[in-house]
């Protein structure tokens, strides 16, 4: 069949089919086209209004920018691991060569890193000295927080031997082939360090000896033992809880990808324990409002504001082309941006009953709209709850609503109606009589004890239902309906009623507001479904560890009539009358689940874990301060918290700052919180708790109290036999081998030194004691020490540096003043003598011998003179290393509840 030919349209046909009207034809049209053009303009205006309403009604991300940043940082904090994977032991000991072929020196490299030089000015401020202690404890924790994996080995005579670079000792000195005399003993010792292949808890590991300081080894041993022996129970408990969490939140959680957790070739490392302890989150001082804001960000879903069926308005209050009823005038308006902000406040308060309350914003006299006030008075009663268990408005809000609600009942003119006022003069104390019918408006008066006059009247608004969190069992049931029973509009039916609705319809009908009564009746189903969605959001999406505990929630309702405000709130938001009208007409409909509901358990656990770390640091630091009060004479109660607070992670610190924005946190609040025994277990806490054991021996963190002033001449040795002098590896140090005998030691405590300094006789007193050859101990305070290893004689300021500062201050009057500061860092130095073969015998003799004024005692000195037989004596620890065929997997990324693609990440 041939293709038909295209017909050419005439000009008249083109005009008739044109989607737009042409200007000259409109001008010449007798009227029909003009009417169509006008109708198009009307439709365009209507569509613009609908588009504006839709844009305003689209709900944006409810998270404020600062809260959004906090939770983003918390999520990144989740990726931080409290451990690191090492193949070999870090180098803790190194060797310094000497001119001797038999002796050399072993230096504790870890002590060098810990005992770094500090500023003198920081020691007199207790908070800064506490910060120094915390930093050194953290350095021990970081040094010991490692797991060994795939240790390097080799075979000697069929035995598996650990490589020399995996021992924790830099053996390049004593085991070097250049030292022909001593290389053989050191090499033989290393060849005896056999690796044992073991099976611990169905995990393949290698056990071998190594060198490590005691404080660091304790942390490493505790971390390794926990990963090997205890992680599977933690994993099982976390999986069971996450399964229950997913079922409650109506999200799918699949652990099909984690089925090999009990495999001998896989080790899962769980840095954080799930779930978080809610009591720990709620014992933070004044945390009610910050937790409320955080909970809002975690659980409020994205949604939109929709209008009910337009036929409801058209067949009730807007059935005529022109109408003058108050409802018809207001329900046809478009909300402004400011009014939509108030609508969001209203729905936010409905999602957080008792915690967020609404108050009517006062308006200037020239802006008062009596019609809006009267309509808001009626609709506000249908929208808000005012007892007995739920409150959405403040005690001051019912006053304006009650004053204006009767206007709607009195404005409608009616011949056969009588209004009889009561004796009290209250706004609702009147009776409407119509024939034999009568309605007492006192039924609509508020009563917080029973909820009269508002949506919570005569309904069971709070039920009991178990949740994944033990501190929350309440189930909010606005209007008395279980949300799951009525939320599906297709099957819930049309007979959903509640007491206030029936009473309000009766009041509107008897007062002559028949159209308004019909509107409220037709809106009943939409209203019930509105609250069903809100109840579901509260009971499902908003339930978290940050939810207000049941007893505190009930306490807010109990103290509500007294208009009391406490640390838990309530938070008051102001709204306008027009916002109430628009909130009743617009229904909040969730369109997507909250984004953070998937990793909410991990965020809660991360936050609780770092709170526990802060408590651990503060409590242990306070114990250290109490045990060494001589070093912290001017310490104040909150100095420990001031030292710990700056070391908190940034997002945790920001949440604490949110607390200070709403309520003043006192020292008593902080003290009560720190004394609480509640903690959230984690690998961070395990390592930190073990690291704090180092302060039992202050030398482990580079502190000592055995500091003495004593004249110790630096010897000048005659070089009669240069070869023997070199062979002996002669050295000088101000570190004593033992404490001075009691008969040769004098202690000058702080009180004695202050007394003699005030009299201007401190130097004289110390000089007399030094002339007698005594060791003068300057107090019993702990002082930080640092290690120096100069290649030649230390400078004069190091040799003569005193552990205290005593100087006269400028005189501004007849009284002399002195400054006495007891705490100064002490240098522990070590100097090796080197002799040239062509040196004269008196090469090292000085006519005026140098003096070292300060001596100190360290139980385990950081430097020792050793031989080839004793060089490796520090290799006395047994280490466990995971074999290369074992996979180390971190579980932090796999604890995103509801994500079927949450895979454990490689820990290497």
UniProtKB/Swiss-Prot annotation:
KW Transcription regulation (keyword) present: no
Keywords: Capsid protein, Inner capsid protein, Virion
Subcellular locations according to the entry: Virion
Coiled-coil residue windows: none
Highest taxon, organism lineage: Viruses
One Gene Ontology molecular-function label: structural molecule activity
Entry's Gene Ontology cellular component terms: viral inner capsid
Segments of this protein annotated with the region Disordered: 1-25
Compositional bias per record (Polar residues), positions renumbered to this chain: 1-19
Pfam entry (one): Orbi_VP3
Keyword Transferase tagged: no
Family: Belongs to the orbivirus VP3 family.
Name of this protein: Structural core protein VP2
């Amino acid at each position: 069949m041939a293709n038909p030919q295209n017909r050419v349209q005439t000009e008249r046909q083109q005009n008739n089919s044109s989607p737009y009207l042409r200007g000259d034809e409109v001008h010449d049209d007798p009227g029909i086209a003009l009417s169509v053009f006008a109708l198009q303009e009307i439709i365009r205006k209507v569509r613009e209004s609908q588009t504006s309403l839709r844009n305003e009604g689209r709900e944006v991300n409810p998270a404020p920018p600062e809260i959004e940043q906090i939770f983003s940082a918390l999520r990144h904090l989740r990726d931080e691991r409290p451990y690191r994977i090492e193949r070999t032991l870090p180098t803790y000991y190194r060797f310094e060569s000497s001119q001797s072929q038999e002796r050399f020196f072993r230096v504790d490299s870890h002590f060098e890193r810990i005992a770094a030089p500090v500023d003198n000015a920081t020691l007199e401020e207790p908070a800064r000295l506490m910060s120094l202690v915390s930093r050194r404890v953290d350095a021990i924790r970081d040094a010991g927080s490692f797991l060994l994996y795939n240790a390097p080995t080799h075979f000697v005579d069929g035995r598996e031997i650990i490589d020399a670079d995996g021992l924790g000792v830099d053996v390049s000195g004593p085991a070097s082939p250049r030292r022909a005399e001593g290389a053989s003993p050191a090499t033989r010792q290393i060849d005896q360090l056999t690796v044992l292949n073991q099976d611990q808890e169905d995990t393949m590991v290698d056990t071998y000896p190594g060198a490590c300081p005691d404080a660091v080894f304790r942390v490493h041993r505790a971390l390794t033992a926990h990963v090997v022996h205890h992680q599977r129970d933690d994993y099982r408990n976390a999986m069971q809880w996450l399964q229950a969490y997913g079922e409650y939140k109506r999200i799918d959680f699949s652990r099909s990808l984690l089925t090999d957790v009990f495999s001998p070739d896989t080790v899962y490392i769980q840095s954080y324990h799930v779930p978080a302890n809610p009591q720990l989150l709620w014992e933070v001082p004044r945390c009610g409002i910050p937790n409320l804001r955080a909970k809002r960000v975690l659980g409020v879903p994205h949604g939109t504001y929709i209008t009910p069926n337009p036929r409801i308005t058209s067949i009730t209050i807007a059935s005529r082309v022109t109408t003058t009823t108050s409802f018809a005038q207001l329900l046809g308006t478009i909300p402004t941006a400011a009014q939509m902000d108030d609508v969001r406040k209203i729905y936010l308060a409905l999602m957080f009953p008792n915690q967020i309350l609404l108050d009517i914003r006062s308006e200037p006299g020239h802006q008062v709209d009596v019609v809006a006030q009267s309509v808001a008075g009626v609709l506000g009663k249908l929208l808000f709850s005012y007892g007995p268990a739920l409150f959405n408005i403040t005690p001051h809000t019912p006053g304006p609503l009650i004053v204006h609600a009767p206007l709607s009942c009195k404005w409608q003119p009616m011949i056969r109606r009588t209004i009889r006022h009561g004796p009290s003069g209250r706004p609702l104390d009147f009776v409407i009589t119509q024939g034999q019918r009568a309605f007492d408006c006192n039924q609509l008066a508020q009563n917080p004890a029973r909820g009269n006059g508002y949506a919570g009247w005569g309904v069971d608004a709070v039920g009991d239902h178990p949740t994944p969190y033990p501190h929350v069992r309440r189930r909010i049931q606005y209007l008395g309906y279980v949300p799951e029973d009525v939320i599906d509009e297709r099957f819930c039916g049309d007979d959903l009623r509640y007491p206030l609705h029936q009473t309000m319809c009766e009041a509107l009908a008897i007062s002559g507001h028949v159209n308004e009564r019909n509107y409220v009746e037709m809106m009943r189903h939409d209203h019930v479904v509105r609250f069903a969605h809100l109840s579901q959001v509260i009971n499902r999406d908003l339930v978290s560890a940050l939810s207000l505990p049941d007893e505190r929630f009930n306490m807010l309702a109990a103290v509500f009539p007294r208009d009391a405000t406490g640390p838990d709130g309530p938070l008051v938001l102001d709204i306008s009358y027009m916002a109430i009208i628009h909130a009743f007409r617009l229904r909040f409909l969730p369109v997507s689940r909250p984004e953070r509901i998937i990793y909410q358990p991990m965020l809660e656990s991360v936050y609780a874990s770092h709170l526990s770390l802060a408590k651990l640091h503060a409590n242990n630091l306070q114990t250290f301060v109490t045990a060494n009060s001589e070093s912290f004479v001017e310490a104040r109660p909150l100095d420990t918290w001031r030292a710990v607070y700056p070391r908190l992670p940034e997002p945790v610190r920001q949440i604490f700052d949110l607390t200070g924005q709403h309520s003043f946190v006192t020292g008593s609040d902080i003290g009560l919180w720190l004394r609480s025994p509640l903690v959230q277990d984690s690998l961070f806490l395990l390592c930190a708790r073990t690291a704090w054991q180092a302060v039992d021996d202050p030398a482990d963190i580079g502190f000592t109290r055995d500091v003495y002033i004593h004249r110790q001449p630096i010897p000048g040795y005659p070089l009669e036999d240069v070869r023997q002098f070199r062979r002996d590896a002669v050295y000088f140090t101000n570190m004593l081998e033992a404490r001075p005998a009691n008969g040769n030691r004098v202690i000058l405590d702080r009180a004695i030194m202050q007394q003699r300094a005030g009299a201007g006789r401190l130097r004289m007193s110390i000089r007399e004691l030094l002339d007698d050859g005594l060791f003068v101990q300057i107090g019993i305070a702990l002082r930080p020490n640092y290690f120096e290893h100069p290649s030649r004689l230390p400078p004069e300021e190091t040799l003569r540096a005193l552990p205290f500062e005593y100087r006269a201050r400028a005189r501004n009057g007849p009284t002399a003043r002195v400054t006495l500061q007891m705490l100064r860092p002490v240098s522990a130095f070590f100097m090796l003598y080197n002799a040239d073969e062509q040196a004269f015998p008196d090469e090292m003799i000085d006519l005026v011998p140098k003096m070292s004024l300060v001596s100190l005692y360290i139980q385990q000195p950081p430097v020792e003179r050793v031989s080839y037989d004793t060089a490796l004596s520090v290799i006395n620890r047994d280490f466990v290393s995971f074999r290369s065929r074992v996979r180390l997997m971190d579980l932090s990324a796999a604890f995103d509840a509801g994500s079927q693609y949450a895979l454990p990440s490689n820990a290497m």
